[in-house]
Amino acid sequence: MSQVRGGRIYCCNLGDSRCVLAREEGGKLKAVGLSDDQKPERADERARIIKCGGRVAPLEDENGEAIGPQRVWLATMMMPGLAMTRSFGDHVAESVGVIPEPEIMDYPLTSNDRFMVLASDGVWEFLDNQAVVDLVASCSGNGPEACKKVIKASYDAWTREEDVVDDITCIVVYFP
């Protein structure tokens, strides 16, 4: 969740959705991350999970080979298998340190800031921040068109790389 107020952007993040700002620098748009994903790969997040008695490891196939990202597990059970370290309402994961507490960040809005993109992990799994900013920039201020373009690129990447497609949500906010 983000709010623009009084010349500042307030970004409140929980989990692996992300907020990215497009800032013009030297005539080009640069992606600036306004939120940090809370995933088990982050040292501070991993430390909290382990301190609370959880385990961090990827899912494994029948041969013991790692599949996918690091996940949060109970110490002795293969559950919940959450690929993020903060979320609402997951009481099993909460018992091993997954918390519903967001990180709140505050940034000054400048005259060089053009737009921000808020999107679910279904977008960020295969597209990096700059790729998404470039896709949105190619839509000349047309928000619905920009969202469709990001969603299509994300969907296409998922179908190339995986047998399933994650949820894909995208919001674009332009600054005057």
Where are these regions (language model features)?
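PP2C/PPM-type serine/threonine phosphatase catalytic core
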Residues: 1-176
